[in-house]
From Swiss-Prot:
Domains: entry comment: The presence of a 'disulfide through disulfide knot' structurally defines this protein as a knottin.
Keywords: Cardiotoxin, Disulfide bond, Ion channel impairing toxin, Neurotoxin, Secreted, Toxin, Voltage-gated sodium channel impairing toxin
A GO CC annotation given for this chain: extracellular region
Expressed in which tissues: Expressed by the venom gland.
Function: Gating-modifier toxin that non-selectively inhibits voltage-gated sodium channel Nav by shifting the threshold for channel activation to more positive potentials. This toxin moderately inhibits human Nav1.2/SCN2A (IC(50)=404 nM), Nav1.5/SCN5A (IC(50)=218 nM) and Nav1.7/SCN9A (IC(50)=333 nM). Inhibition of Nav1.7 is voltage-dependent, with lower inhibition at more positive test pulses.
Family membership noted in the UniProt record: Belongs to the neurotoxin 30 (phrixotoxin) family.
Protein name per the record: Mu-theraphotoxin-Phlo2a
Disulfide cysteine pairs (residue numbers): C2-C16, C9-C21, C15-C25
Chief place of localization: secreted
Localization annotation: Secreted
A molecular function (GO) term: toxin activity
Length: 26
């Protein structure tokens, strides 16, 4: 899980949306 203010998740360029790390979310 992740927090809204977290942009990077893992080592990929992902962001946090709905407490989940996703690719290319806004």
């Amino acid at each position: 899980s992740c927090q809204k203010w977290m942009w990077l998740c893992d080592e990929e360029r992902k962001c946090c949306e709905d407490m989940v790390c996703k690719l290319w979310c806004k």
